[in-house]
UniProtKB/Swiss-Prot annotation:
This is Calponin-1. The modification Phosphothreonine is found at T170, T180, T184, T259. The keyword Ribosomal protein does not apply. Part of cGMP kinase signaling complex at least composed of ACTA2/alpha-actin, CNN1/calponin H1, PLN/phospholamban, PRKG1 and ITPR1. It comes from the Eukaryota. Belongs to the calponin family. PANTHER family: CALPONIN. Residues 28-131 form the Calponin-homology (CH) domain. It holds the Pfam family Calponin. Gene3D superfamilies: Calponin-like domain. The keyword Cell membrane does not apply. Calponin-like repeats lie at residues 164-189, 204-229, 243-268. The modification Phosphoserine is found at S175.
Length: 297
């Protein structure tokens, strides 16, 4: 079986865009540093193409065996694809036991099928950092910080409860001291002065407004009746002769005499019509002609 069987075809669309972005993150300077480190440890030449030289997994297995002897029991020298994949899988298991974090490790297909060389490079850099942490002389990677454990006595831990952490704010400079929650009532007296809280309703809180300056005293709610007399003067309305402003005016043009929509309208005006007179018994009826009912003089 040839290795071409495992090669993927060209990527298109979104897959091609993702592949190009991953390729742009590949660092060729780091590749040269990793090449020198691996060749120096194993004593073997990788070749012109760095990833193709690591693709069979042989150099990788020998490399981890140099860092941690006995990590890979058997290294397959065969050119068969499954043997090469087995070497890569054994290398991944070995570096996991060595201490490399799982999220830093590449997958076998990332190297064997050339899908993500950037992740392969990141794994080798993480391996270099772990090797440097373990004391190996490596010029690549960053040494991981060691744990600095501290043990405190219970008395010290209890004392820490009296300290206000920075996350809780500060008790100096400008603060929200004296501020009340939104919607709560604020009084005009200060409890620090030792005065008792008033028991009547004479104290006006700041949230209720002020009793000086312009105010809404005397204002009524929309739709309520407004009287034209002032109750503060001791005047009381005892009759219905006082017309409120909301009822309109009794002077000028008005709607007096208007009827509700739909009611019948009379064609005569009672002011200009006489009261009809009916003939008495024995009186001639011609004197009471219908036209005599109107004042036509």
């Amino acid at each position: 079986m040839s290795s071409a069987h495992f090669n993927r075809g060209p990527a298109y669309g979104l897959s091609a865009e993702v592949k190009n972005k991953l390729a742009q993150k590949y660092d060729h300077q780091r590749e040269q540093e990793l090449r020198e480190w691996i060749e120096g440890v194993t004593g073997r030449r990788i070749g012109n193409n760095f990833m193709d030289g690591l693709k069979d997994g042989i150099i990788l297995c020998e490399f981890i065996n140099k860092l941690q002897p006995g990590s890979v029991k058997k290294v397959n020298e065969s050119t068969q694809n499954w043997h090469q994949l087995e070497n890569i899988g054994n290398f991944i298991k070995a570096i996991t036991k060595y201490g490399v974090k799982p999220h830093d490790i590449f997958e076998a297909n990332d190297l064997f099928e050339n899908t993500n060389h950037t992740q392969v490079q990141s794994t080798l850099l993480a391996l270099a950092s772990m090797a440097k942490t373990k004391g190996n002389k490596v010029n690549v990677g960053v040494k991981y910080a060691e744990k600095q454990e501290r043990k405190f006595e219970p008395e010290k831990l209890r004392e820490g409860r009296n300290i206000i952490g920075l996350q809780m704010g500060t008790n100096k400079f400008a603060s929200q001291q004296g501020m009340t929650a939104y919607g709560t009532r604020r009084h005009l007296y200060d409890p620090k002065l030792g005065t008792d809280q008033p028991l009547d309703q004479a104290t006006i809180s700041l949230q209720m407004g002020t009793n000086k300056g312009a105010s809404q005293a005397g204002m009524t709610a929309p739709g309520t009746k407004r009287q034209i007399f002032e109750p503060g003067l001791g005047m009381e309305h005892c009759d219905t002769l006082n017309v409120s402003l909301q009822m309109g005016s009794n002077k000028g043009a008005s709607q007096r005499g208007m009827t509700v929509y739909g009611l019948p309208r009379q064609v005569y005006d009672p002011k200009y019509c006489l009261t009809p007179e009916y003939p008495e018994l024995g009186e001639p009826a011609h004197n009471h002609h219908p036209h005599n009912y109107y004042n036509s003089a």
